[in-house]
Amino acid sequence: MASDLTPHAGMAGRATVPGYDPKKHDPFFDGVSDALADKGFVVAAADDLVTWARTGSLMWMTFGLACCAVEMMQASMPRYDVERFGFAPRASPRQSDVMIVAGTLTNKMAPALRKVYDQMPEPRYVISMGSCANGGGYYHYSYSVVRGCDRIVPVDIYVPGCPPTAEALVYGILQLQKKIRREGSIER
């Protein structure tokens, strides 16, 4: 018999977290499943449907500025595989919902960060990853460092650490999805 981590036909080559079942962690999905089993069709508010779809299909754009970007890349690798949460990378800001600012933001780079943020479609979200992006970090007193990317763009989730682990970034992504579900409106 295969263990929880042994790949089998249903896994399509992906590693899973033992004991994690996405169906158990999404109350909207539970309601949809119950309604389908009971009546054969679902009646739901369009706002709830859009919010549910939005949390399961977030496209992220990297803004890797320093060593935190290495941990951000690791979160996309097979061990953590953030795409299983519907969090897929995109290279263009016009196709992205989330920007991950990872690393030290300098005064010279700040206008480029704002320009890329302005090119993202609404609703857009920002994850600040690492001590340098959160508040300047080790280089806080340098003349050329912005003391937190929240001075340039509005930040939704802060991921602490120097550098934060890939697990911390995955937790931040899950918190962003929870925040989007809590807001629950089409307009942000």
From Swiss-Prot:
Cofactor: binding details: Binds 1 [4Fe-4S] cluster.
Record-linked Gene3D superfamilies: 3.40.50.12280
Gene Ontology molecular function, alphabetical: 4 iron, 4 sulfur cluster binding; iron ion binding; NADH dehydrogenase (ubiquinone) activity; NADH:ubiquinone reductase (non-electrogenic) activity; quinone binding
Subcellular location: Cell inner membrane
GO cellular component, one term: plasma membrane
Enzyme class: translocase
List of residues binding [4Fe-4S] cluster: 67-68, 132, 162
Pfam families, A to Z: Oxidored_q6
Catalysed reactions, semicolon-separated: a quinone + NADH + 5 H(+)(in) = a quinol + NAD(+) + 4 H(+)(out)
SUPFAM superfamilies for the chain: HydA/Nqo6-like
Main location: membrane
Obligatory cofactor(s): [4Fe-4S] cluster
PROSITE patterns for the chain: COMPLEX1_20K (PS01150)
Subunit structure: NDH-1 is composed of 14 different subunits. Subunits NuoB, C, D, E, F, and G constitute the peripheral sector of the complex.
Similarity section: Belongs to the complex I 20 kDa subunit family.
General function of this protein: NDH-1 shuttles electrons from NADH, via FMN and iron-sulfur (Fe-S) centers, to quinones in the respiratory chain. Couples the redox reaction to proton translocation (for every two electrons transferred, four hydrogen ions are translocated across the cytoplasmic membrane), and thus conserves the redox energy in a proton gradient.
Protein name: NADH-quinone oxidoreductase subunit B
Name of encoding gene: nuoB
